[in-house]
Amino acid sequence: MTPTIITDVKSFAIKPDRHNLVVVKVETNKGISGLGCSTFQFRPLAVKTVVDEYLRPLLMGRDANEIEDIWQVMNVNSYWRNGPITNNAISGIDMALWDIKGQLADMPLYQLLGGKARTAIPAYTHAVADNLDDLYHEIDRFLAAGYRYIRCQLGFYGGNPSQLQTPEEPISGSYFDQTDYMETTLKMFAAIKEKYGNQFQMLHDVHERLHPNQAIQFAKAAEPYQLFFLEDILPPDQSHWLTQLRSQSATPIATGELFNNPMEWQELVKNRQIDFMRAHVSQIGGITPALKLAHFCDAMGVRIAWHTPSDISPVGLAVNTHLNIHLHNAAIQETIELPANTQSVFVGSPQPKGGFFYPMEKSGIGITFDEEAAADFPVVYRPHEWTQSRTPDGTLITP
């Protein structure tokens, strides 16, 4: 096979709608270019700098066909590795190289990887409201659209300190009463189960805001409601507690969106401490490591449910779709509603139909990036507070 020489690497940090997105474009001497997702919305300019200043000079003139070797070179080039900024930068290039290879082969990515493992991947969406009546309205809307898996949440991950008993002059920010959260959420599960029966299966995201003993109590109490999975019940640095949790509860556990380093998941998967791996593909370095992780999980009976939040580019969404169509142990795909500006910048974005994502048939990843449209939406950064929830006494909760 004749070499496909990398002639340029470009990065784009944009904010077409609510979130900052980072996209990488790799150009070649054959006139074929590829796209990749490097989105890390909390540090977009840091990721862009790594792509532009460090990875671009490293890759110029290399053969784009050599994906595995290029990934290994990018991973070890800085010596210190497996951090979210570098991993996301690597991901953008890695995805773009797979996109190029698919176009050269005139095959969609899922076919390049080995073909379909299923006709379509089930999708789940998010029903979020401040009260049960509004939540029922959201659920009804999604049921009518064909969804049979719905993540149900009452409120956001925190509240106003004026609503809680706090010390005088509390620190400003988002507050979270763990006991109240557990009681309210269990009542929500019961109410939804009573109203809808088995019309759909619930999912729920704790977002790591419980202490280990609370997590065990909560997982046990959730058993009667037969959740599809309970997500991120503990932060990664408390994952060893999952051994005790698994011994006391049959509620399916999903985790992984904060993982960067293989050492964070190897023991969890090997010891079957989770049911679903929720890794964020760009956060672990792209398609190349995602395939290795998925195959490792498959051997251990752990299913895949890639993290697909609203702060992911349509390129990342498309990659998840291709992976989920191909991988034997893919279980479900999170879905997001793409706003109008985002759709104008990224043409060909996958959309669920009747509660499923179907195969994308264009060669490569299948997304077109409109650089002129993107130029109208420069990146805008501001500090985010939602990661900084506090208990009523003011203690910061580790997500």
Curated annotation (Swiss-Prot):
Q: What does this protein do?
A: Has no detectable activity with D-mannonate and with a panel of 70 other acid sugars (in vitro), in spite of the conservation of the residues that are expected to be important for catalytic activity and cofactor binding. May have evolved a divergent function.
Q: Where does D-arabinonate bind?
A: 207, 257, 278, 307, 334
Mind telling me which PANTHER family this protein's record contains? Answer: D-GALACTONATE DEHYDRATASE-RELATED (PTHR48080), STARVATION-SENSING PROTEIN RSPA (PTHR48080:SF6)
Q: Does the keyword Nucleotidyltransferase apply?
A: no
Q: Which GO terms describe its biological process?
A: amino acid catabolic process
- Which family does this protein fall into? Belongs to the mandelate racemase/muconate lactonizing enzyme family. GalD subfamily.
Task: Show the disulfide pairing.
Answer: none
* Name of the featured protein: D-galactonate dehydratase family member EGBG_01401
| Binding, Mg(2+) | 205, 231, 257
Q: Does the keyword Transmembrane apply?
A: no
Keywords of this entry: Magnesium, Metal-binding
Gene Ontology molecular function: magnesium ion binding
